C-alpha cells in the first residue's frame, strides 16, 4: 500500500507540475514560482532553506524540490511575520551551513534590526526577498473576501516598503537586485561566497497563490461562513453588510 501510494504521488507530481512555462514571463515582474524553480537548480544538499509567513509559506512547500540533506524550516502553526530573519541566525550559528530564508518584503522589514547581528558575525545567510511591493497574501485575501477592496496592503493605500539597498548598505551587507529572470545567474554567483547577502527580487505585484481551495464557480466561502455552518437565513439576518453566500446548498 505504501509503495503504491508513493508511486501515485510521483505520478501526480509529473502529471500536474507546480511550475509551468507561463511563469517565465517576467514582463510585469518575476513570478514567485520561477524564483523557486531557479533555487531548485541553484541550491545544493548542504543548504538549509527557510520560509516566513505569507506568500513564501504557501509556495515553498509545493514549489521547492528538496534534495537529500537539505532541510526546509518554517513556522506554519504561528505564521508569525518576521520570524525567518532572526530564526535564520540561530540556524546558521548552530549548523554552520549556508542558510537561505525566503521572505516577503513585508515580513522582512518587521525584524530588520536583526541584520546587525548577521553583519557582526558575518553569517552565511542568503536572504531571498520576494519583493511584490506590499502584503501580497493579505491583498489577495482582501480582494477575494471584500469585493476587491484593499487597505493597508500596498503603496496606494498606506503601505510603504523601504529601500532595501540602503538598508543593506547601512548594515554593511552585500546587496543584489534581480529585476529579470535573465539576471538569475547573479543569484547563483552569490552562493559562491561565504557571506551574508540580501537578494532583492522584483516580483509581480499581482499573483495568485496556487493551488487553493475554492468552489467550482471560482469563489471562496468567506470567513463568516465557517463550520459548524449556520443557515443562509441566519447569516443574512445577522450580517451588518450584504455578505456573499457561496457555499453549495446541496
Where are these regions (language model features)?
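Active-site diphosphate/adenylate-binding microenvironment
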Residues: 8-94
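Terminal amphipathic helices with adjacent charged low-complexity linkers/tails
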Residues: 1-7
